[in-house]
Structure formats: C-alpha cells, structure tokens
C-alpha cells in the first residue's frame, strides 16, 4: 500500500524518522526546533524537518489522489523582547523529496527571492506568517495564515492575531485535504479563539507523484528573532479514487 500514517507524541533527539536541513534539530526536551537564534548566525536563519519516507500523493497510472489529515502543536519562542513581536513564521509543506532549503527569513525556507509562480518548485504549503510586514511586498500587510502554491505569495490568506502569542502559548493546528473536492482546509486554534479557512488546490497539477512532508521555519535577525517549535505531530494519508 502507498498509504502512510505516523504519530510523534514528542520527538527523539536520536531518532531516525526525521531528516533535517539548515538549523532544524530536535532538542533534548523532545521538541522539534525549526530554526535557531543567537550570535554568530546569518541574518536570515531557516531550517527544514521532514519525515524520512516519501509517499505517493497521486498516481498517474490509476488517477488516484491522496486525501490526508495532519495535526500538530507549536509555539513561538521570541527574543530578546517578546513585546517587539515575532518573525518570520513556519510552514507545513508537501514538496519533492530532494527539495533544498531555499531562502530563509520571510521566504520561510521554501522559495527564492522572486515571488512569481514557478511550477518547478512543485510545492504546496500552509504558512503561519507572524509578520506580514509591508516590507514584504508579497504579503498582505498583516500577520496571517496562507496557502502557498509554487510561490511565496499565498493564493489565499486569513488574518491572524499573533500579538499576545509570544509567551509560549500553544497553537493547535489541524490541516486536511479532501481529494474528491480538491479542498485544502487549515484550522489554527488557541485557547481564546480559532481561525480556519479552505481553498481549492489541485495536487495533480502542482505536486510530483511522490512527495515528502514536513515543516520549515524562518526568522530574521533584528530584534524579533523567533524560534518555531513543534511539540507533536500526527499525519495520515490514503490514496483514493477521484470522484
């Protein structure tokens, strides 16, 4: 079967089920840290962590496309002053298994400097953008959840109130893809409120048959350095016939 399912209640610093690029690593506390902060690091700091085994998201032979569900918890650790806000965000992504770590900072490790659509990326991501700054001309100008398809400019964004989120408040994320309707839905829940949105994405048109799945995180040095930390992760995908 090309179906896949896994669950991490926490992460093992010595485990073999994740691969890393850039500044991503598992801490001794069992937390998956997507990027570091500190002195002696580049201005833009990023990292990727992905599940070690690629899986089939669609089949050219049968026409099947996978539906999936994933859930995880994350929090933002800001320094030196949480009142300054956070930067730049994290993503949950599907991409080619050998895709590189690209530009960090506001590009979140998935894309290069151009915000033009580029089908060679073969990447679909849900981004949790904590900045949305006007300086990032591709962003809507406010912090947001966005869906990215082969470009850093989201095809749809939903405003998120990240203020008051910088003191290790835990976010609960639930993301689903329904193959029959090509509907990608992302839900972000904090103790006080919930944000969710859905958008149509054609996986066959935008992803290779086999993909890897994981997370990226990125921050920019300059007073709002943030580590993006994943506490746990569940993922399950099933190939099914298109209706």
Curated annotation (Swiss-Prot):
Keywords: Calcium, Glycoprotein, Lectin, Manganese, Metal-binding. It holds the Pfam family Lectin_legB. Ca(2+) binds at residues 129, 136, 139. Belongs to the leguminous lectin family. This is Anti-H(O) lectin 2. Homodimer. InterPro entries: ConA-like_dom_sf, L-lectin, Lectin_LegA_CS, Lectin_legB_Mn/Ca_BS, Legume_lectin_dom, Leguminous_Lectin. The keyword DNA-binding does not apply. One of its GO terms (molecular function) is metal ion binding. Glycans are attached at residue 115. Lactose- or galactose-binding anti-H(O) lectin. Coiled coil: none annotated. It comes from the Eukaryota. Mn(2+) binds at residues 127, 129, 139, 144. The keyword Magnesium does not apply.
């Amino acid at each position: 079967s090309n179906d896949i399912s896994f669950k991490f209640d926490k992460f093992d610093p010595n485990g073999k089920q994740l691969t890393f690029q850039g500044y991503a690593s598992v801490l001794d506390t069992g937390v998956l840290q997507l990027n570091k902060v500190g002195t002696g690091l580049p201005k833009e700091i990023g990292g990727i962590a992905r599940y070690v085994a690629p899986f089939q998201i669609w089949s050219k032979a049968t026409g099947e496309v996978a539906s999936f569900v994933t859930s995880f918890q994350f929090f933002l650790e800001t320094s030196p002053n949480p009142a300054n806000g956070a930067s730049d965000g994290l993503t949950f992504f599907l991409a080619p298994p050998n895709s590189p770590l690209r530009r960090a900072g506001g590009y979140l490790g998935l894309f290069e400097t151009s915000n033009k659509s580029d089908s060679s990326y073969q990447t679909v991501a849900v981004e949790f953008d904590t900045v949305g700054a006007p300086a990032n001309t591709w962003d809507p100008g406010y912090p947001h959840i966005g869906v990215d398809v082969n470009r850093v400019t989201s095809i749809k964004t939903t405003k998120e109130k990240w203020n008051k989120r910088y003191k290790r408040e835990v976010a609960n994320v639930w993301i689903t893809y329904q193959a029959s309707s090509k509907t990608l839905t992302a839900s972000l829940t904090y103790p006080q409120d919930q944000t969710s949105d859905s958008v149509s994405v054609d996986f066959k048109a935008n992803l290779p048959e086999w993909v890897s799945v994981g997370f990226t995180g990125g921050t920019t040095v300059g007073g709002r350095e943030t580590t993006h930390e994943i506490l746990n992760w569940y993922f399950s995908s099933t190939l099914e016939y298109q209706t």
